[in-house]
């Protein structure tokens, strides 16, 4: 089997309904996978039940059987029994902390490597990379390690935008990612803009959506990646 993983930048684009823009991206992964497990651990300011309800409503037209991992007495068995895995956005540090707490990091990687579809957005995309070192989130809790699922052998930065409000003197996103590349010049970072996604199908990696992505690696800074690009070469990073 081969990896089938969809990494969405965000759950919304502008004022669109929750996950509405992502339906065309998600649908191809659900053809033979109807029983999905949703992992809400990134949700800190909402209850897991409410988070699950939002996802079920947002994906209702796909007619999937979605349950929350928090509803199962054995989280590891729930992962094994599901046809596919969904991980939502929120705080990436809390998400990874809980994945380690329930000993799910290695298991999810193994299950996805066997062909189980994986769909993540925002924090759920952050944890698909080598590590969470390029998340935008505040480190509200300390996971045992920053090492993540490694479904992609590089770093991701969802919600990518280099906008700087007039009069604001903090660093831009590009400046923050430059800092990363100074410390680790050999590891690529792909910034994915809201409304776009990366789709890994085995040895193929594609940029989906109508927005460019941006590459940061060593001396290469904020290099535009055109819409529809084949990024398979990054799987050899």
From Swiss-Prot:
Its main location: cytoplasm. One of its GO terms (cellular component) is cytoplasm. Belongs to the peptidase S51 family. One of its GO terms (biological process) is proteolysis. InterPro entries: Class_I_gatase-like, Peptidase_S51, Peptidase_S51_dipeptidase-E. It comes from the Bacteria. It catalyses: Dipeptidase E catalyzes the hydrolysis of dipeptides Asp-|-Xaa. It does not act on peptides with N-terminal Glu, Asn or Gln, nor does it cleave isoaspartyl peptides. This is Peptidase E. CDD domains: GAT1_Peptidase_E (cd03146). Hydrolyzes dipeptides containing N-terminal aspartate residues. May play a role in allowing the cell to use peptide aspartate to spare carbon otherwise required for the synthesis of the aspartate family of amino acids. It is found in: Cytoplasm. Its EC number is 3.4.13.21. One of its GO terms (molecular function) is dipeptidase activity. Pfam families: Peptidase_S51 (PF03575). SUPFAM superfamilies: Class I glutamine amidotransferase-like (SSF52317).
């Amino acid at each position: 089997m081969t990896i089938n993983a969809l990494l969405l930048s965000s759950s919304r684009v502008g004022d669109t309904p929750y996950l509405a823009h992502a339906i065309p991206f998600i649908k191809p992964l659900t053809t033979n996978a109807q029983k999905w497990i949703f992992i809400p651990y990134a949700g800190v300011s909402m209850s897991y039940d409410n988070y699950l309800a939002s996802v079920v409503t947002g994906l209702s037209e796909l007619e999937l059987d979605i349950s929350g991992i928090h509803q199962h007495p054995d989280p590891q068995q729930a992962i094994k029994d599901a046809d596919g895995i969904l991980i939502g956005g929120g705080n990436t540090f809390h998400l990874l902390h809980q994945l380690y707490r329930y000993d799910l990091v290695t298991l999810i990687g193994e299950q996805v490597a066997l062909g189980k579809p994986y769909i993540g957005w925002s924090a759920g995309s952050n944890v698909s990379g080598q590590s969470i070192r390029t998340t935008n989130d505040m480190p509200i809790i300390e996971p045992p390690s920053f090492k993540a699922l490694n479904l992609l052998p590089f770093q991701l930065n969802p919600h990518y935008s280099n906008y700087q409000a007039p009069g604001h003197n903090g660093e831009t996103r590009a400046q923050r990612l430059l800092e990363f590349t100074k410390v680790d010049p050999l590891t690529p970072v792909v910034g994915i803009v809201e409304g776009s996604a990366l789709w890994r199908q085995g040895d193929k990696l594609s940029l989906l959506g109508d927005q460019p992505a941006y590459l940061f690696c060593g001396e290469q800074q904020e290099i535009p990646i055109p819409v529809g690009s084949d990024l398979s070469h990054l799987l050899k990073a």
